[in-house]
Amino acid sequence: MKESEIKIKISLDENKVPEQIHWTAEDAGERDQKSEAVLISLWDAEQQNSLRIDLWTKEMKVDQMKTFFHQTLMAMSDTFERATGDEKMADDMRRFCQYFAE
């Protein structure tokens, strides 16, 4: 079985607040890419629970965060539809995203 790694490096200030976020995915040809935020969700099937890592740098502006969330929610709507086939719910989610963007 082939394995692949995605590495995320977080630089923290003295108060453990993220100052820099860099990621590498060598299989995709990406090395030391800078990012201002990362949201990771993992599913624990045994516990039937989501595990999350939500980080953003202190330099990220509120308007950037709103755009980031809007784009993330839109992508989640598409992923939800592909994963479940539930077009109606995905459309409801997209309508919320339109409202969110206003």
State where each predicted segment sits.
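Short, charged/polar N-terminal "headpieces" of proteins
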Residues: 1-32
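Generic structural hydrophobic/aromatic packing signal, biased to beta-strands
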Residues: 8-10, 21, 38-42, 76, ...
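Surface-exposed beta-strand edges and their flanking turn/coil or helix-capping segments
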Residues: 21-23, 32-38, 66-68
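Acidic, aromatic-enriched beta-alpha/helix-loop junctions
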Residues: 27-58
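Alpha-helix boundary/N-cap detector
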Residues: 30, 60, 64-67, 71, ...
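Cysteine/selenocysteine-centered motifs that mediate thiol-based redox chemistry or coordinate metal-sulfur cofactors
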Residues: 46-82
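C-terminal charged interaction modules
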Residues: 78-102
